[in-house]
Amino acid sequence: MRIEEDLKLGFKDVLIRPKRSTLKSRSDVELEREFTFKHSGQTWSGVPIIAANMDTVGTFSMAKALATFGILTAVHKHYTVEEWQAFVQGASADVLKHVMVSTGTSDADFEKTQQILSQNPQLKFVCIDVANGYSEHFVQFVAKAREAWPQKTIIAGNVVTGEMCEELILSGADIVKVGIGPGSVCTTRVKTGVGYPQLSAVIECADAAHGLGGQIISDGGCTMPGDVAKAFGGGADFVMLGGMLAGHEESGGTIVEENGEKFMLFYGMSSESAMTRHVGGVAKYRAAEGKTVKLPLRGPVDNTARDILGGLRSACTYVGASRLKELTKRTTFIRVQEQENRIFNSL
């Protein structure tokens, strides 16, 4: 047993210090970025925000809606091969440019993903997603995926430390997904005692990945647009959002009605709800590590997307970053004990 004494920080522990700026307007800020990925050699440009690969976020409808903003969607892994084919046939090239195919690490997952990619070569991203990216089996699967799909951009996660980030990149991942336990409907930290404050994880993993020519995704922990700005400021190349995009018309959750008001169910992918839906229940050897919540219906996702992008542009103007790429270079975090005036939060 050992104890690390250095303090680890989450988004709530810091604010971004404002700096002098020559920007006259938020409209002067360029949020699009261009990346050429280490292993695939593919080049992509767009707004580096990703809708999470959750049942009630990463849907085909969400992908079509967010592509109009240049935002990516990691489509959840539970669509069939036939559903994928129908979606691809009816989607424009611009939409497909912003779509990731998600997969687990079982043999069945591999075969299904192989079929989807062979039938739809326009799809360029594969997101290999497990809750715990520290297993040897996971590293081996990433290497197998790289060998099978050499020209696809591969995302692998989740991890929270630099050495594992490096391991995944060296095994064939172009992008590493960072985050254990920060999600709004994730209970891993309280069920297992395992986790890592998200901002520190992002800072440390970004340093490791960038040293090898890879990228990272900050996955989880964002509750408001300011958190998205902090993730980018900490060095994240992409930011993945779940709860902030849940509850919309495009989210795909079950709608329930209580006392005349409609709500949409949103649940973690390791929750009892998810496991009951996809594998018939929680296995005897494990515990659910997610929860289910009811969200008031929020209408189309367009307004939320604009709010997030507007907040991000504003953050850039406060530190004088004319492009999103410059935000991390212009960011100085200050430690704080308060974030906002909460006097009217209960109203």
From Swiss-Prot:
Domain of life: Bacteria
Binding-site residues, NADP(+): 108-131, 216-239
Tagged with keyword Coiled coil: no
GO molecular function terms attached to this record: GMP reductase activity; metal ion binding
Binding-site positions, K(+): 181, 183
GO process terms (BP): purine nucleotide metabolic process
Keywords: Metal-binding, NADP, Oxidoreductase, Potassium
EC number in record: 1.7.1.7
Active site, per annotation: 186
SUPFAM superfamilies in alphabetical order: Inosine monophosphate dehydrogenase (IMPDH) (SSF51412)
Biological role stated in the UniProt entry: Catalyzes the irreversible NADPH-dependent deamination of GMP to IMP. It functions in the conversion of nucleobase, nucleoside and nucleotide derivatives of G to A nucleotides, and in maintaining the intracellular balance of A and G nucleotides.
Assembly mode: Homotetramer.
Record-given protein name: GMP reductase
Organism the protein comes from: Klebsiella pneumoniae (strain 342)
